Amino acid sequence: MAPTKKPQKNKQSKNEIASSLIPNSGHKKPSKAPKLLISPENEDRLRRLLLNFRRTPSPVTATLSVTQKRKKLNNLYENLSCEGFLDNQIELVLSSLRDGATLETALDWLCLNLPSHELPVNFSNGASRFPSTGRSVAVISKSKKDWNVSAESSVQEVKEVPESEVLVRVKSKRDEEEEDSLSSCQPSQADWIHQYMKRLEEEELESSDDERDKVSGPRSFEVIAKEYCVERYNAIKAKRKGDKSGQSQAGLAICKLKEEMNALGPSEAILESEFQRDRQDCEGAREKEVASSVLDDVHESVNADAFFFQLFDDLTLDTNPVGSCKSEEQESVVSNDSLDDLDLGDLFDEDVPPYVPSPHELLELQKKEIMRELCNEKHLTKLNGIWKKGEAQKIPKALLHQLCQRSGWIAPKFNKVTGEGRNFSYTTSVMRKSSGFGKSRQAGGLVTIQLPHQVEDFESIQDAQNRVAAFALHKLFSDLPVHFAITEPYASLVLIWKQEESLGITSREEQRREKFVESLLEADNFSLTTTSRGIHSALPMVDSCVKENDDLDVVKSNHRARRNSSMAAECSSLKQKQENKKKMQKYKDMLKTRAALPISEVKKDILQKLKEKDVLVVCGETGSGKTTQVPQFILDDMIDSGHGGYCNIICTQPRAITVAQRVADERCEPPPGFDNSVVAYQVRHQNARSDKTRLLFCTTGILLRKLVGDTTLKDVTHIIVDEVHERSLMGDFLLIILKSLIEKQSWDNALPKLKVILMSATVDAHQFSRYFGQCPIITAQGRTHPVTTYFLEDIYERTKYLLASDSPAALSSDTSITDKLGSVNVPRGKKNLMLAGWGDSYLVSEDSLNTSYDSIKYIASAVVDYDLLEELICHIDDTCEEGAILVFLPGMSEINMLLNRLAASYRFRGASGDWLLPLHSSIASTEQKKVFLRPPKGIRKVIIATNIAETSITIEDVVYVIDSGKHKENRYNPHKKLSSMVEDWVSKANARQRMGRAGRVKPGHCFSLYTRHRFEKLMRPYQVPEMLRVPLVELCLHIKLLGLGQIKPFLSKALEPPSESAINSAILLLHKVGALEGDEELTPLGHHLAKLPVDLLIGKMLLYGGIFGCLSPILSIAAFLSCCKSPFVYAKDEQNVDRVKLALLSDKLESSSNLNNNDRQSDHLLMVVAYEKWVRILHEQGFKAAESFCESKFLNSSVMRMMRERRVEFGMLLADIGLINLPKGKGRRKENFDVWFSDKTQPFNMYSQEPEVVKAILCAGLCPNIAEGLVNRLTKPAEETQRYAVWHDGKREVHIHRNSINKNCKAFQYPFIVFLEKLETKKVVYLQDTTVVSPFSILLFGGSINVHHQSGSVTIDGWLKLTAPAQTAVLFKELRLTLHSILKDLIRKPEKSGIVHNEVVKSMVHLLIEEGKPQHT
């Protein structure tokens, strides 16, 4: 007897559920998928919610013909039937899904809509998995409606359910225990499984032996056939002689031979074989006209032929071909009667007409031919080792057991199906292995087989089991002649089943299926016909529609006339105002100033070329005035010519606000956006325009957004693209669109003529001219004075500066460049590449430019030397004439650093400190105006700026320029899969632009903080276009949002097209994130991401953070991820930093977030806590207290300030698309916005204090950066001294970086982490900035999800596997699709900011919170 197992409890504790997620140890990657379970309450609630939500199904794009639809529906019907679903269930799902039905969607629909007890067992409870195969289980079964588990289910008698009702098979308690034992697959159960299977085999063999003993060995067919012919001959002779006694004896012998032949098996086939042979002999005898001496033999043959034919007909046409033989007396009477009626007829008559068989006879002949082939003994060799001719036939159960054993399958198992009365009915289950390759491959798995159209039960258990075993032999071993080896009546049954399949006899199920499929097709055709009729019925209305259209044309014509009249009045008004301004003295003075600019010399040429050509390139040196004057040239010309009302000029300008204000001042008009001002600006968060606007300065992004609603720009007369030489990503993208518009209007005269002006500050204008078909170029000379340039070696000599050994700008006190280069094994020719990281002081010393430059050897050129900057500014202030100082630094953090140092010095205290002016794009425009003012006499103005002051902004009184040689540009980090601002050296063109800023009013001086060698040999001639160095995902989203076609063909039209690999990488990432689907179709998520000008992963995180009500922590995490620096400053003693991190999570402040109470296994939540504590101290105690906090917690205060700026920037972006609301009446200060975004009472922060929700959204943003843990396995990496947990990222073994808070963890809440980036060394791959996330987060927000319904498992992103019942897995999949539908609805209603209250969103949040609660024993 098999060993018993303890029954499993109905409910698992949460600790058991959590522990089931821990994978086995000892493998390179998890060998068994973690098991996922949710509470029944949550599952039921989610299912009811999703069924009530009624998500709109995805539209079907592919159109199929009727034949293709029929084939598709038949295949689906067959596949679902094989999976164990009932006909009415299959018809229900196919009727619901119609053309959108696939096997996957149908299984999803069934798992979602059917109760658990109406599904095949594998779909409701997950699949059993066997050690030998590991394959999924496919079930063919029927069960009872109103399923109820009962301890007595194996013996309890249940009334038969009508066929019209849904049937679901009930498993006995013993069966369930056995299946559970097999599904567990634990190594400790191997002995139990082996013993259990051995017991089953012994029982089957004992049963088969008992049956075999009851069957006597039959004689061979040849012996029986020979005796049969002899007895038939004797019967004929006795009849001819009138011997009644002889006829009776022959009849009795014939009856016994018939019984023996029936016991042998396929009696119909035997008789058919004899009939064919004797018939041929008879026909041969007829053709030769045999002599009368053999007439008796011919008569005997003919009569035997007739008997065989009649007997075969009786057997083949009888519904029960194998029946009990009649009694001997009855058979004798029948035989005698048949012999009396025997007559040769006109067998030997001549002139017999040719025989033409009827259709029925043809069918009968076909049946006989099939039977003859089936009974051909040449196929017996296939049964070698199982049965051979002459051996006793076996019962079907025994033969099935042996064939399964030979195939390496687990022994068949018979399951009782309860029926009415005391009769019996059984099904059999066989676990098959997969076999074959390619198209001939057959999947393995558990197959449960039931008799077809079973209308009777069987009074004997053995009979019922042998019947279903015979059918299993027919289904599973159809290529074997099993009918030879099994006893009657089962052999005849197998032959009948084979004959039905060969003749294509349609069963009742097939008839039902065909009828259903045709009804679906007819319904589709009716729908199409109705549509067609609707179209035809609408034809009589064409005349009335044409009349309405004519009326509409009249209305449009009247509107056009009124508009023209209004425009004429506007043109006249603008011209009059222009004439009045020319009389104003202020305007006259301004005209004189404008006329003195170099660009005024080519004014006539510009206007003339624009009349002749559609595209013009204007190239002017810095200070020529092209940015402010060219737009005014065009506007003034149109106003003076009386067409000012039609004028609509858009100028793309990175510094739109400043330039617009400058132009408005020059025109003596009110500020942009006010009444009577034709100048306006529009940037991301500010819009200063009115109905009177005729000249708009905006960013490239604003113009692209306008293109979404107006792809032809029909109302725009001129587009001026300034600073095209900067080669920004969106700038080059805009050029592709403008070129397409120009080409389109060249052959379509109906389109308005758009004029395009490209303005560049460099001499590389010919490249743009060639791109637009050799368009004309107009060059204006710059107005500059000579500029003297001092390089780093000159600055050291002039200031006598000595680099301190402990300065941050020093490499080290004991290591020189020569030592560092010597330690690197690279050829001498590659030393220049190494110098890019350590500076070029080594080449300075080699060239022996000056012997006093010893300090330069130790300069780390990657670091800004603030000591040198401060000393140089003081040196200029002390030794040089008056004039403003312009300092170029890479970014805002560097600007703040230098400002703080200067403000703290004695020199710039008092009034002088008021003229320390920062200049950055994030500074308010009102504050930027001060840089154009002149300071009081005796005070030097110091402007500290980024590259904003490089081209567009011209500050007239600047005489001295200090150039750090650095700037920040957008770069793609392949490790982080993020784009970020990276500090790098400027190009030669950029450096010359900065030098030129010193010679605006008089000869100037430029102090370059890099060597002459770097400028002449190492700097690039021009900046690399962004399209060639940044990820293209944002650009691809804009292409799809604007409906510009396929991505690759469009980008191939660029000025410098990106590589195909870069395009493919972007498209692949968009598909993985869920922004694209199918053939580059934009999803609702992609539609929203296209409107967020941020990195793709951060954009997705922000979007979901607003939807799921945890915006504030997500803003902090997104700001942290987007910063290029870590907020933690790691001291030499890293253990102090680790202790501080733990203290941040442990120490609580009053009213602070409770994130730190619920979860400590997250570097990202650590940053949330750190930021919240820092900003609280900043608001309550001030700047100095916040600085002290940063010092005590090893935090970088500049990074914390940068995070606050990014938080505000990201929050404003979400407000722009209508996802959240902005405060009213609180001003535009960043502090106010940051407080608003942190307000826990706002709907978008409803769940901001729930760690599981925050981590789920973090998972959504960082996917596919997921790793699965081998939690029970510890190993010591090659570069470590301790043993740590091992993780797997789907490709290889990885480890958590030592700077992560999770590094020293030995027990994890879940075996899954998300991470920001990988750090790869020679031997180990590390994960930085990790967070432990739940499997529910991965199922909801991870990569692509693939549900394996039969095996009860889920695959995420193609590699991460979880074990979950099909119904549970489908729930999560449907939740994803429902969220997709919500995002789609948000597109139509962007102002619907209360989406956090959506019932589906609330249910998803509730699931994450409930299932993520701490486990208690």
From Swiss-Prot:
Ranges for domain Helicase C-terminal: 868-1043
**Keyword Hydrolase part of the UniProt annotation:** yes
Q: Provide the reaction this enzyme catalyses.
A: ATP + H2O = ADP + phosphate + H(+)
Q: Which residues form a coiled coil?
A: none
List the Gene Ontology MF annotations in alphabetical order: ATP binding; ATP hydrolysis activity; RNA binding; RNA helicase activity
State the SUPFAM superfamilies in the record.
P-loop containing nucleoside triphosphate hydrolases (SSF52540)
**Segments of skewed composition (Basic residues):** 1-12
What are the annotated GO cellular component locations? chloroplast
Q: Which SMART domains match?
A: DEXDc, HA2, HELICc
* Subcellular localization(s) per the UniProt record: Plastid, Chloroplast
* Stretch forming the transit peptide: 1-61
**Is the keyword Plastid in the record?**
yes
- Location of the region described as Disordered in the Swiss-Prot/TrEMBL record: 1-37
Give residues annotated as binding ATP: 620-627
Which EC numbers does the record give? Answer: 3.6.4.13
Q: Where is this motif: DEIH box?
A: 722-725
Keyword annotations from UniProtKB, A to Z: ATP-binding, Chloroplast, Helicase, Hydrolase, Nucleotide-binding, Plastid, RNA-binding, Transit peptide
PROSITE patterns assigned to the protein according to its UniProt record, in alphabetical order: HELICASE_ATP_BIND_1, HELICASE_CTER
Q: Which residues form the Helicase ATP-binding domain?
A: 607-781
Sequence similarity: Belongs to the DExH box helicase family.
Kindly provide the name given to this protein in its UniProt entry. DExH-box ATP-dependent RNA helicase DExH4, chloroplastic
